[in-house]
């Protein structure tokens, strides 16, 4: 997702931690988690 990458890059979940990432992107649902976990 280009929008996600522009917003904070693919390393966003590493920088802030998975808990923060999931909470921050809760509106994106599991789709966001799947993309970032891989």
Curated annotation (Swiss-Prot):
Residues recorded as bearing Phosphoserine in the entry: 2
GO biological process: biomineral tissue development; defense response to bacterium; defense response to fungus; killing of cells of another organism; positive regulation of cell-cell adhesion; positive regulation of metabolic process; positive regulation of substrate adhesion-dependent cell spreading; positive regulation of vascular wound healing
Record region (Disordered): 1-38
Highest taxon in the source lineage: Eukaryota
Protein's cellular compartments: Secreted
Compositionally biased residues, Basic residues: 8-30
Keyword tRNA-binding among record annotations: no
Keyword Phosphoprotein attributed: yes
GO CC annotation terms, alphabetical: endoplasmic reticulum; extracellular region; mitochondrion
Disulfide bridge partners, by residue number: none
Alphabetic keyword roster: Antibiotic, Antimicrobial, Biomineralization, Fungicide, Phosphoprotein, Secreted
Family statement: Belongs to the histatin/statherin family.
Role, per record: Histatins (Hsts) are cationic and histidine-rich secreted peptides mainly synthesized by saliva glands of humans and higher primates. Hsts are considered to be major precursors of the protective proteinaceous structure on tooth surfaces (enamel pellicle).
Name of this protein: Histatin-1
């Amino acid at each position: 997702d280009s929008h996600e990458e522009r917003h904070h890059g693919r390393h966003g979940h590493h920088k802030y931690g998975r808990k923060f990432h999931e909470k921050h992107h809760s509106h994106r649902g599991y789709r966001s988690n799947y993309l970032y976990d891989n």
